[in-house]
Amino acid sequence: MAMTKKLYNLMDWAEIEAITYAEEDHPKAVLGAHPVRGGQTLVTTYQPKASEVSVKVKGSRAAVKMELADEDGYFAVLVKNKEPFDYELEITDKEGKEKTIKDPYAYPDSITKRDIQKFNSGINYRVYDMLGSHVMKMNGVSGVRFAVWAPNALRVSVVGDFNGWDGRLHQMERLFDSGIFELFIPEAGEGEKYKYEIKLHSGQTIMKRDPYAFLKEDNDDLAGIVYDLDRVPGSDSSWLDKRDEIQSYEAPLMIYDHGKTDFSKKDAREIAKYAAEYGYTHVTVSGVFDPLYIAGVDPEEIAGFTDALHKADIAVLIKWEPSAFSNDEGGLSVYDGTCIYEDGDGKRAYVPGSERKYFNLGRDGVKNYLLGNAMFLLDVLHFDGLVVSDVAKMLYLDYGKSESGWTPNMYGGNENLDAIDFFRQLSTTIHKYSSDILLISDDDTTFPGITASVDDEGLGFDYKINHGWNRDVLGYMRQEPLGRSNHYNEICFPMIYQYNERFILPVYDTADIWNEMPGDRDEKFGNLRTLISYFIMHPGKKMLTAQSPEGKGKEIQAIQTLIKDVIAFYNKNETLYSKELEPSGFEWINNISARENILVFSRRGNKKDDVFVVVANFANVPHKGYKIGVPRAGRYTEVFSSDAEKYDGFGFVNKNPIFSEASECDGRNDSIRIRVAPLSVSVYKYSPAKATK
């Protein structure tokens, strides 16, 4: 049928060609309903698979057949309505199948210019509410709004189950000439898989995953799955009311480093039971991320997982890796044909020895992505803190690279200035959102000021995991007891820098550590008991992966009992945790007995009489009547010994209180004489009493 002259004159053939070639980034200028002169409205649609299309205006008796303006499937018709009206498209495909749809190009843009300005400035911290797929109603019609950042794309389309993965059908609208593309699709719904088809200026078409998808397939394809975030419940107010106290610097912090989880209810129950049984205050978990949103797990299930642990009064921390992403072709790499998530400088982009790329932290759209993901984990999924991995890789441009394999910063140095700014913005943003969220740095560098405040030119983390402590102490413990004298400085060294940062001390996989300990089976257990006990008594918050050595003997049960008891001892004694981040909470008494391999120090709490004296014997030699200096005159009662018989020790303990003598030792006026078990840690609680002469 020949097109009417009036309709023909309304056709913008250049724009129509852009639509039919799938190269249009402003399809709403061409498609949908547009008022024209004469009190009429031009309705157009692009349906390349259709043989016939009609417009059914709401309230009218009959549908109006559209004319085929372009043989590639561009249909148009003039409707005698001037005011905006509701309509549907009745489509008959070339096989005779019929369907009726709402026109996606009949709906207004819902992302505002203000939203985009905040994104372009790197301060849209809930960017996950803007980008990605969102189940919503538009003008009373249910559907899904899709939005993606692809600033250098020629055209972006949503493809998925709802359109047969045909990129011609749902070409997205570029908003305000920005890099954000949006489209509301009425026939899309929750549970449908989707991706973005991106056409490059070279003419090449690529398929990309949605970086902001709340749910993804748990397979290699990792297609996004439309998910209604309203199904995720809010945080438990009763938990939030007490979280500030639980996460205080003056509260005990005993982290169970659990590792990967499937976030199931069963896993939550098992972790909560284990953590409660052993006395852990926090649990650290990790998931499968792509690259930052957890793949294959329902967000409602993840929030349920965290809430289940909260009901057991256990805080949940998640390991978060904002340093890099996979270089696979369907992910963030060269997302719109250009380097928008990575640096265009290959020396800065590539992670040495891996198929990964570093995020370009100098770009606001990237910072928004990372900061938004952090807020999503904390606000939507109810995590209580982030353990940030690979901080060192982010802070240093030359990390793991050859001398010629990196590009210096603008001042010629190796510090990543963008990473420093990013971490400061991250810590400021998170702590402004909630002051009781924990931000923990997992890095092994001497970069200064990790836990210093941003106002003091620090990065603003709450804690830093002290891998140096783990390395030095385990290096010492791996030596034969008789040979430890030559390595005595290694066990003392961590206290030199203990208060440079707010440290968390890690002990990973006690089963592996047991295998590394010297000596026969009994000595291995003695060393392990000593290590765990020293770890708890040493200043610094704690992180433990408590996996007992293999077997079911009494030694295994004894180690498990020791771990439970020593954690309980830590949790109930403010002397050990209230001032463990302050120099005033610790004092060396004897750190010069290399020949005996003995250390003696005091731990102090907030009250004057909150004093413990800790004696650690790293040799397999016992001592009777061993003289040690004490902080003040009084009574000293042994309240813990790793050599107790219930821990499969020798029971070489001090059962009765010991009164100090006015006899100089270790540079102090008062002293006590004690029994010191081999390979042991013992703790003496001070109470006021007159010293004996």
Where do the PLM segments sit?
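Short glycine-biased active-site loop of nucleotidyltransferases that positions the nucleotide triphosphate
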Residues: 67, 173, 327-334, 339-341, ...
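Hydrophobic residues within beta-strands of alpha/beta enzymes
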Residues: 53, 156, 283, 384-386, ...
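An acidic- and aromatic-residue-enriched active-site/binding cleft used to recognize and process polar
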Residues: 151-153, 161-163, 199-201, 288-290, ...
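Conserved alpha/beta catalytic core and glycan-binding cleft of carbohydrate-active enzymes
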Residues: 382-384, 402-548, 571-628, 632-643, ...
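Substrate-binding/active-site clefts of carbohydrate-active enzymes
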Residues: 213-225, 229-232, 236-415
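Alpha-helical packing segments of well-folded alpha/beta enzyme cores
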Residues: 271, 301, 305, 366-377, ...
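Carbohydrate-interacting/catalytic domains
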Residues: 1-256, 261-264, 269-279, 525, ...
